[in-house]
Regions:
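P-loop NTP-binding core
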Residues: 1-251
Length: 251
């Protein structure tokens, strides 16, 4: 039986922040405009540069801390503490693009995993090794009585409808990876960097990006609520792509 890390909510909540963005709006009861900070509709627990040292310390210490706590469940216990004390619809854990100790901990803490991937062969090759790790995490979680969906789906990003190679690579993913792929793709845009530089969301300054993310959220909710229907839907998509491709070849 694994040891459990007990977190103090009073300590944890001090690291949770509600981010804001600067906008202009008409002052109440006045014709004058003023600059105000408006809160986003979510909270964050931001990372920091010293976090990069944590993974190094974890690797040097092995699978356990000095106190004997198993690292694999550390973020799981942290998330459990947040769930018990705060009312969030969803908790999203963003991880670095590397299968290190922190990413493994985050995978254990997640009820389901979304795999973002650029549209290039090297990124696709990494999906298979990642899937093997995700399958191991899922089996380990179930052995501890923890509900875990494994990989929910692959999300293609930096997508451009103007590049025929992107369409070909999308078809490649559907054909050669048994893992479901979201129909939504996050399109490539310079606005993403502009939003990041100005402390804004990509969707705030790009209407097409907002439509992409709205559609993605709908897909994720559907996949979480009805797994069998989700898998059937993604399979039907591949069958449609395959039929269209065969039709083009015959012509």
């Amino acid at each position: 039986k694994r040891e459990i890390e007990e977190f103090d909510w009073e300590d944890v909540k001090n690291f949770i922040y509600t981010p804001t963005y600067l906008t202009r709006r008409r002052a109440e009861g006045s014709t004058n405009w003023e600059s105000v900070n408006v809160p986003f509709g979510f909270d964050i627990m931001p990372s920091a540069l010293p976090l990069s040292l944590v993974e190094l310390q974890m690797a040097m210490a092995g699978s356990k801390t000095a106190s004997g706590k198993i690292y694999l469940y550390y973020i799981y216990d942290l998330v459990k503490c947040i769930k018990e004390n705060a009312d969030y619809d969803y908790i999203i854990i963003d991880t670095p693009p590397a299968l290190g100790a922190l990413t493994t901990c985050a995978m254990m803490a997640a009820e389901a995993i979304i795999v973002p991937s650029n549209l290039d062969i090297m990124s696709f090759r990494g999906i298979q090794s990642f899937k093997e790790s995700a399958d191991y995490i899922q089996e380990t979680a179930k052995a501890q009585g923890i509900e875990h969906r494994g990989i929910l789906g692959i999300l293609l990003s930096l997508y451009s409808e103007r590049r025929s190679v992107d369409k070909a690579l999308e078809e490649y993913v559907h054909e050669f990876y048994p893992t479901p792929t979201f129909q939504t793709q996050i399109r490539e845009s310079s606005d993403a960097k502009r939003a990041n530089a100005n402390g804004m969301l990509f969707a705030q300054i790009n209407k097409k990006a907002k439509a992409d993310f709205d559609k993605l959220v709908d897909e994720i909710e559907f996949a979480l609520k009805d797994p069998k229907a989700w898998e059937k839907k993604t399979q039907e998509l591949w069958e449609k792509i395959k039929a269209e491709r065969e039709g083009e070849v015959n012509e």
